[in-house]
Amino acid sequence: MNYIILGPPGAGKGTQAKKIAVKFGILHLSTGDMFREAKKSDESISKLLSSGQLVPDEIVVNMVRKRLEKNNIKKGFLLDGFPRTVKQTGELDRMLMSENIKIDSVFLISVPFEEAAKRIAGRIVCACGASYHTMLLPPKEFGKCDCCGGVLFHRSDDKEEDIIRDRFSVYEKQTKPLIEYYKESGLLIYIDGLKSESDVFEQISGCIINGE
């Protein structure tokens, strides 16, 4: 059970990845979580993320490699936010090949920019990793996390439309070539990201259960 989940900013990758990992008992590896942790102590990464730009391939690959080596991935894993470039894809292939591990499926959650921007603008998060939406998935108590009671906030790269548009543009330029790569390899599965969160979850779960 080894999977990759792709999609533009605001597609709901992180939300779905966490739920899928719990349901099937596999490891969730999120580069987004890794970056947000790293930016606390690395000013260069912080500046890149705040401007909507991609972190250099060498840094990303090294972070993922360390995380894969640190965790037991024999039971399966779900990569969320990686790979994002053709170079990262090649590095991932080499990493997995050395361990005789293969990717079973690549899920692409597809949503247009307008919908993604709307979702991002309303997204609020907690330091514990929980994510909410002011309209679509509000917390039980305004401004307070249901999981730990922490204060909810907007991520810095979610606040300005120009940054959101830049992030989407970077995705279009850097990540879309991967779609063709995984399509040609027969691993790509399209997921309609405009459906409800529960419907998207059921669609991905169904594909995994059916061995697609």
Curated annotation (Swiss-Prot):
Alphabetic keyword roster: ATP-binding, Cytoplasm, Kinase, Metal-binding, Nucleotide biosynthesis, Nucleotide-binding, Transferase, Zinc
Primary residence: cytoplasm
Record localization: Cytoplasm
Record-listed E.C. numbers: 2.7.4.3
Region (NMP): 30-55
GO biological process annotation, one example: AMP salvage
Positions of ATP binding: G10, A11, G12, K13, G14, T15, R123, S131, Y132, K195
Record has Phosphoprotein as a keyword: no
UniProt-annotated stretches for the region LID: 122-158
Record bears the keyword Kinase: yes
Catalytic reactions of this protein: AMP + ATP = 2 ADP
InterPro entries listed in its UniProt record: Adenyl_kin_sub, Adenylat/UMP-CMP_kin, Adenylat_kinase_CS, Adenylate_kinase_lid-dom, ADK_active_lid_dom_sf, P-loop_NTPase
Residues that coordinate or bind AMP: T31, R36, Q53, L54, V55, G81, F82, P83, R84, Q88, R155, R167
UniProt-annotated binding residues for Zn(2+): C126, C128, C145, C148
Coiled coil spans: none
Pfam families: ADK, ADK_lid
GO MF terms, alphabetically ordered: adenylate kinase activity; ATP binding; zinc ion binding
Enzyme class, broadest EC rank: transferase
Subunit field text: Monomer.
Family the UniProt entry places it in: Belongs to the adenylate kinase family.
Name assigned to this protein: Adenylate kinase
